[in-house]
Amino acid sequence: VDTGVVSGKLRIDSWDDGQDPVFHDEKRGRFITNMGFANFVTAAVDSDDERIKGSCMVILEEDDPGLYDRGTPTQKLVHQLSSTRDPAFNLKIPADRIIGGYTVKDGVIIPNYSHAEIIESVFRRTRVPVGIMSSAKLLSAPEPIIRYHRQRFRGGASTSPGTPRYDLGLQQKEDCLQRLVDIWAAGEAGSALGFLSARLFDDFDVIEKENERIFAEQGIKGRAQLKVFRKVQVDALEYLKMKTRPVAEQDAARLQELENDTLVQFLITDSLANVFCPAGKLWNTGHGATILREAVSLMGGYGITEDCPGFLGQKWMDAQLEATYEGPEAV
Protein backbone atom coordinates (compact mmCIF):
# COMPACT_ATOMS: atom_id res chain seq x y z
CA VAL A 1 0.00 0.00 0.00
CA ASP A 2 3.05 2.31 0.18
CA THR A 3 4.72 3.86 -2.83
CA GLY A 4 7.93 5.11 -1.27
CA VAL A 5 8.80 2.66 1.52
CA VAL A 6 8.69 -0.36 -0.77
CA SER A 7 9.54 0.36 -4.41
CA GLY A 8 6.51 1.10 -6.57
CA LYS A 9 7.20 2.87 -9.85
CA LEU A 10 5.06 3.42 -12.94
CA ARG A 11 6.30 4.66 -16.29
CA ILE A 12 5.00 4.65 -19.85
CA ASP A 13 6.36 1.76 -21.90
CA SER A 14 4.67 2.75 -25.16
CA TRP A 15 2.01 5.21 -26.29
CA ASP A 16 1.12 4.99 -29.97
CA ASP A 17 -1.06 7.57 -31.70
CA GLY A 18 -4.74 6.77 -31.28
CA GLN A 19 -3.98 4.02 -28.77
CA ASP A 20 -4.13 3.80 -25.00
CA PRO A 21 -0.74 3.86 -23.30
CA VAL A 22 0.97 0.73 -21.99
CA PHE A 23 2.65 1.03 -18.59
CA HIS A 24 5.76 -0.56 -17.16
CA ASP A 25 5.23 -1.30 -13.48
CA GLU A 26 7.87 -2.21 -10.92
CA LYS A 27 6.71 -3.17 -7.44
CA ARG A 28 7.88 -5.12 -4.43
CA GLY A 29 5.43 -6.13 -1.73
CA ARG A 30 5.91 -6.96 1.92
CA PHE A 31 3.77 -9.18 4.15
CA ILE A 32 1.04 -9.61 1.53
CA THR A 33 -1.81 -11.88 2.69
CA ASN A 34 -3.05 -14.67 0.37
CA MET A 35 -0.16 -14.03 -2.03
CA GLY A 36 0.57 -17.73 -2.32
CA PHE A 37 -2.43 -18.27 -4.60
CA ALA A 38 -3.52 -14.76 -5.70
CA ASN A 39 -3.70 -14.40 -9.49
CA PHE A 40 -4.08 -10.63 -9.32
CA VAL A 41 -3.09 -7.86 -6.93
CA THR A 42 -3.68 -4.15 -6.48
CA ALA A 43 -0.50 -2.13 -6.06
CA ALA A 44 0.28 1.44 -5.01
CA VAL A 45 2.71 3.12 -7.39
CA ASP A 46 4.35 6.51 -7.85
CA SER A 47 5.01 8.16 -11.18
CA ASP A 48 8.49 7.61 -12.59
CA ASP A 49 7.59 9.43 -15.80
CA GLU A 50 6.91 13.12 -16.40
CA ARG A 51 3.93 12.07 -18.54
CA ILE A 52 2.19 10.56 -15.48
CA LYS A 53 1.12 12.80 -12.61
CA GLY A 54 1.30 11.76 -8.96
CA SER A 55 0.45 8.33 -7.60
CA CYS A 56 -2.29 5.80 -8.22
CA MET A 57 -3.40 2.23 -7.62
CA VAL A 58 -3.11 -0.30 -10.44
CA ILE A 59 -4.26 -3.88 -10.98
CA LEU A 60 -1.55 -6.44 -11.79
CA GLU A 61 -2.52 -9.83 -13.20
CA GLU A 62 -0.66 -13.11 -13.28
CA ASP A 63 -0.81 -13.34 -17.10
CA ASP A 64 0.63 -9.88 -17.74
CA PRO A 65 3.95 -9.86 -19.66
CA GLY A 66 6.92 -9.82 -17.31
CA LEU A 67 7.74 -10.99 -13.80
CA TYR A 68 4.95 -12.03 -11.42
CA ASP A 69 6.93 -13.55 -8.55
CA ARG A 70 4.94 -14.53 -5.47
CA GLY A 71 8.09 -14.36 -3.38
CA THR A 72 9.21 -16.34 -0.36
CA PRO A 73 6.76 -17.33 2.39
CA THR A 74 6.83 -15.17 5.51
CA GLN A 75 7.85 -17.16 8.58
CA LYS A 76 4.81 -16.31 10.70
CA LEU A 77 4.14 -17.74 14.13
CA VAL A 78 0.39 -17.16 13.84
CA HIS A 79 -2.49 -17.04 11.32
CA GLN A 80 -1.09 -20.11 9.63
CA LEU A 81 -4.18 -20.68 7.49
CA SER A 82 -3.44 -17.60 5.37
CA SER A 83 -0.55 -17.47 2.92
CA THR A 84 1.71 -14.45 3.46
CA ARG A 85 4.63 -13.61 1.17
CA ASP A 86 6.94 -10.84 -0.06
CA PRO A 87 6.21 -10.67 -3.81
CA ALA A 88 8.01 -8.86 -6.63
CA PHE A 89 6.52 -7.59 -9.89
CA ASN A 90 7.98 -6.22 -13.11
CA LEU A 91 5.12 -6.11 -15.60
CA LYS A 92 3.64 -4.37 -18.61
CA ILE A 93 0.00 -3.43 -18.11
CA PRO A 94 -2.64 -1.48 -20.09
CA ALA A 95 -3.61 1.98 -18.88
CA ASP A 96 -7.15 0.88 -18.05
CA ARG A 97 -5.70 -0.94 -15.04
CA ILE A 98 -5.56 2.35 -13.14
CA ILE A 99 -8.20 2.02 -10.43
CA GLY A 100 -10.75 4.82 -10.79
CA GLY A 101 -9.65 5.68 -14.32
CA TYR A 102 -7.69 8.66 -15.58
CA THR A 103 -7.82 11.72 -17.81
CA VAL A 104 -5.26 13.11 -20.24
CA LYS A 105 -4.42 16.81 -20.15
CA ASP A 106 -1.70 18.38 -22.29
CA GLY A 107 -0.19 14.96 -22.91
CA VAL A 108 -0.04 14.09 -19.21
CA ILE A 109 -1.95 11.17 -17.67
CA ILE A 110 -3.77 12.30 -14.52
CA PRO A 111 -5.25 9.49 -12.37
CA ASN A 112 -8.70 10.32 -11.01
CA TYR A 113 -7.67 9.09 -7.56
CA SER A 114 -4.29 9.02 -5.83
CA HIS A 115 -3.20 5.84 -4.11
CA ALA A 116 -3.70 7.56 -0.73
CA GLU A 117 -7.35 8.39 -1.47
CA ILE A 118 -8.12 4.78 -2.38
CA ILE A 119 -6.21 3.29 0.54
CA GLU A 120 -7.92 5.62 3.01
CA SER A 121 -11.34 4.63 1.70
CA VAL A 122 -10.48 0.93 1.93
CA PHE A 123 -8.72 0.91 5.30
CA ARG A 124 -11.36 2.88 7.15
CA ARG A 125 -13.76 0.07 6.28
CA THR A 126 -11.54 -3.00 6.57
CA ARG A 127 -10.24 -1.96 9.99
CA VAL A 128 -13.75 -2.50 11.37
CA PRO A 129 -13.91 -6.30 10.82
CA VAL A 130 -10.35 -6.68 12.15
CA GLY A 131 -11.57 -5.37 15.50
CA ILE A 132 -14.54 -7.72 15.40
CA MET A 133 -12.18 -10.66 14.78
CA SER A 134 -10.54 -10.14 18.17
CA SER A 135 -13.88 -9.65 19.92
CA ALA A 136 -15.18 -12.88 18.39
CA LYS A 137 -12.27 -14.74 19.98
CA LEU A 138 -13.17 -13.29 23.36
CA LEU A 139 -16.80 -14.34 22.99
CA SER A 140 -15.67 -17.89 22.22
CA ALA A 141 -13.61 -18.09 25.42
CA PRO A 142 -16.17 -18.35 28.29
CA GLU A 143 -17.66 -21.71 27.26
CA PRO A 144 -14.41 -23.77 27.27
CA ILE A 145 -13.26 -21.97 30.44
CA ILE A 146 -16.51 -22.81 32.26
CA ARG A 147 -16.29 -26.42 31.09
CA TYR A 148 -12.69 -26.72 32.28
CA HIS A 149 -13.37 -25.07 35.65
CA ARG A 150 -16.39 -27.20 36.49
CA GLN A 151 -14.69 -30.46 35.53
CA ARG A 152 -11.39 -29.63 37.19
CA PHE A 153 -11.81 -31.86 40.27
CA ARG A 154 -14.12 -34.53 38.90
CA GLY A 155 -12.81 -38.06 39.03
CA GLY A 156 -11.03 -37.59 42.33
CA ALA A 157 -11.73 -39.91 45.24
CA SER A 158 -12.74 -37.03 47.49
CA THR A 159 -15.13 -35.47 44.96
CA SER A 160 -18.61 -36.94 44.66
CA PRO A 161 -21.53 -35.83 42.46
CA GLY A 162 -23.80 -33.25 44.01
CA THR A 163 -21.10 -31.52 46.04
CA PRO A 164 -20.06 -27.92 45.27
CA ARG A 165 -16.53 -29.13 44.48
CA TYR A 166 -17.93 -31.56 41.90
CA ASP A 167 -20.53 -29.24 40.36
CA LEU A 168 -18.59 -25.97 40.38
CA GLY A 169 -14.94 -26.95 40.54
CA LEU A 170 -12.74 -23.87 40.30
CA GLN A 171 -15.81 -21.68 40.02
CA GLN A 172 -16.13 -21.87 43.76
CA LYS A 173 -13.36 -19.28 43.68
CA GLU A 174 -14.69 -15.74 43.38
CA ASP A 175 -11.60 -14.62 41.48
CA CYS A 176 -12.30 -17.12 38.69
CA LEU A 177 -15.84 -15.83 38.29
CA GLN A 178 -14.82 -12.17 38.25
CA ARG A 179 -12.13 -12.75 35.65
CA LEU A 180 -14.55 -14.74 33.52
CA VAL A 181 -17.08 -11.91 33.64
CA ASP A 182 -14.36 -9.46 32.58
CA ILE A 183 -13.56 -11.64 29.56
CA TRP A 184 -17.20 -11.97 28.56
CA ALA A 185 -17.88 -8.24 29.08
CA ALA A 186 -14.85 -7.25 26.99
CA GLY A 187 -16.06 -9.49 24.16
CA GLU A 188 -19.58 -8.07 24.30
CA ALA A 189 -18.33 -4.47 24.48
CA GLY A 190 -15.89 -4.96 21.62
CA SER A 191 -18.54 -6.63 19.47
CA ALA A 192 -21.01 -3.82 20.20
CA LEU A 193 -18.42 -1.22 19.20
CA GLY A 194 -17.44 -3.15 16.08
CA PHE A 195 -20.99 -3.71 14.85
CA LEU A 196 -21.91 -0.10 15.61
CA SER A 197 -19.03 0.94 13.35
CA ALA A 198 -20.17 -1.50 10.66
CA ARG A 199 -23.72 -0.11 10.72
CA LEU A 200 -22.32 3.41 10.62
CA PHE A 201 -20.39 2.62 7.44
CA ASP A 202 -23.49 1.04 5.89
CA ASP A 203 -25.21 4.41 6.32
CA PHE A 204 -22.11 6.32 5.29
CA ASP A 205 -21.78 4.45 1.97
CA VAL A 206 -25.13 5.78 0.77
CA ILE A 207 -24.37 9.34 1.86
CA GLU A 208 -20.85 9.22 0.41
CA LYS A 209 -22.10 8.19 -3.04
CA GLU A 210 -24.66 10.99 -3.02
CA ASN A 211 -21.98 13.44 -1.89
CA GLU A 212 -19.72 12.40 -4.78
CA ARG A 213 -22.62 12.75 -7.23
CA ILE A 214 -23.33 16.31 -6.07
CA PHE A 215 -19.70 17.37 -6.43
CA ALA A 216 -19.40 15.67 -9.82
CA GLU A 217 -22.48 17.51 -11.13
CA GLN A 218 -21.05 20.82 -9.95
CA GLY A 219 -17.54 20.04 -11.20
CA ILE A 220 -16.01 20.57 -7.76
CA LYS A 221 -12.76 18.67 -7.16
CA GLY A 222 -9.80 18.53 -4.79
CA ARG A 223 -9.21 21.55 -2.59
CA ALA A 224 -12.35 23.21 -3.88
CA GLN A 225 -14.31 20.58 -1.92
CA LEU A 226 -12.55 21.64 1.29
CA LYS A 227 -13.72 25.22 0.75
CA VAL A 228 -17.29 24.00 0.38
CA PHE A 229 -17.08 21.98 3.59
CA ARG A 230 -15.79 24.97 5.56
CA LYS A 231 -19.16 26.58 4.93
CA VAL A 232 -21.06 23.33 5.52
CA GLN A 233 -19.31 22.93 8.88
CA VAL A 234 -21.25 25.91 10.24
CA ASP A 235 -24.56 24.22 9.35
CA ALA A 236 -23.35 20.90 10.77
CA LEU A 237 -22.52 22.49 14.13
CA GLU A 238 -25.89 24.22 14.14
CA TYR A 239 -27.57 20.85 13.54
CA LEU A 240 -25.68 19.16 16.37
CA LYS A 241 -26.45 21.95 18.83
CA MET A 242 -30.12 21.88 17.90
CA LYS A 243 -30.30 18.09 18.41
CA THR A 244 -29.15 18.53 22.01
CA ARG A 245 -32.01 20.87 22.88
CA PRO A 246 -35.41 19.75 24.17
CA VAL A 247 -37.89 19.10 21.37
CA ALA A 248 -39.98 22.09 22.41
CA GLU A 249 -37.01 24.41 21.84
CA GLN A 250 -36.05 23.04 18.43
CA ASP A 251 -36.85 24.77 15.15
CA ALA A 252 -38.57 21.82 13.46
CA ALA A 253 -38.46 23.32 9.96
CA ARG A 254 -34.75 24.19 10.19
CA LEU A 255 -33.92 20.83 11.74
CA GLN A 256 -35.67 19.01 8.90
CA GLU A 257 -33.84 21.16 6.37
CA LEU A 258 -30.47 20.25 7.86
CA GLU A 259 -31.38 16.56 8.10
CA ASN A 260 -32.18 16.60 4.38
CA ASP A 261 -28.92 18.37 3.50
CA THR A 262 -26.63 15.67 2.09
CA LEU A 263 -23.42 17.63 2.65
CA VAL A 264 -24.29 18.31 6.29
CA GLN A 265 -25.09 14.66 6.95
CA PHE A 266 -21.96 13.58 5.08
CA LEU A 267 -19.78 15.80 7.24
CA ILE A 268 -21.35 14.52 10.47
CA THR A 269 -21.26 10.84 9.48
CA ASP A 270 -17.71 11.17 8.16
CA SER A 271 -16.63 12.67 11.49
CA LEU A 272 -18.23 9.80 13.41
CA ALA A 273 -16.57 7.25 11.13
CA ASN A 274 -13.20 8.91 11.72
CA VAL A 275 -13.64 8.23 15.44
CA PHE A 276 -15.35 4.84 15.59
CA CYS A 277 -13.16 3.12 12.99
CA PRO A 278 -9.75 3.66 14.68
CA ALA A 279 -11.26 3.44 18.17
CA GLY A 280 -12.72 0.00 17.47
CA LYS A 281 -9.58 -1.21 15.74
CA LEU A 282 -7.28 -0.06 18.55
CA TRP A 283 -9.37 -1.00 21.57
CA ASN A 284 -10.77 -4.28 20.27
CA THR A 285 -7.41 -5.65 19.18
CA GLY A 286 -5.13 -4.11 21.82
CA HIS A 287 -7.31 -4.56 24.89
CA GLY A 288 -8.75 -7.75 23.39
CA ALA A 289 -5.31 -9.36 23.19
CA THR A 290 -4.66 -8.44 26.83
CA ILE A 291 -7.95 -9.95 27.97
CA LEU A 292 -7.32 -13.09 25.89
CA ARG A 293 -4.17 -13.58 27.96
CA GLU A 294 -6.47 -13.65 30.98
CA ALA A 295 -8.54 -16.33 29.25
CA VAL A 296 -5.42 -18.41 28.62
CA SER A 297 -4.36 -18.08 32.26
CA LEU A 298 -7.76 -19.34 33.45
CA MET A 299 -7.14 -22.60 31.58
CA GLY A 300 -4.10 -23.44 33.68
CA GLY A 301 -1.53 -25.58 31.90
CA TYR A 302 -4.04 -26.40 29.18
CA GLY A 303 -3.84 -22.77 28.05
CA ILE A 304 -0.46 -23.22 26.36
CA THR A 305 -1.13 -26.58 24.73
CA GLU A 306 -1.99 -27.15 21.07
CA ASP A 307 -5.20 -28.98 21.99
CA CYS A 308 -6.36 -26.43 24.57
CA PRO A 309 -10.18 -26.48 24.70
CA GLY A 310 -11.36 -23.66 22.46
CA PHE A 311 -7.78 -23.31 21.11
CA LEU A 312 -7.45 -20.28 23.37
CA GLY A 313 -3.65 -20.26 23.30
CA GLN A 314 -3.65 -20.12 19.51
CA LYS A 315 -6.32 -17.43 19.51
CA TRP A 316 -4.29 -15.34 21.93
CA MET A 317 -1.24 -15.56 19.68
CA ASP A 318 -3.35 -14.74 16.62
CA ALA A 319 -4.64 -11.66 18.41
CA GLN A 320 -1.08 -10.30 18.63
CA LEU A 321 -1.01 -10.11 14.84
CA GLU A 322 -4.49 -8.62 14.56
CA ALA A 323 -3.25 -5.57 16.47
CA THR A 324 -1.05 -4.84 13.42
CA TYR A 325 -3.62 -5.65 10.73
CA GLU A 326 -4.44 -2.76 8.37
CA GLY A 327 -1.72 -0.65 9.94
CA PRO A 328 0.01 -1.04 13.33
CA GLU A 329 -1.37 0.60 16.46
CA ALA A 330 0.98 3.58 16.09
CA VAL A 331 -0.68 4.40 12.76
Protein language model regions, located:
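Charged, glycine-rich active-site and insertion segments that engage polyanionic ligands
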Residues: A273-Y302
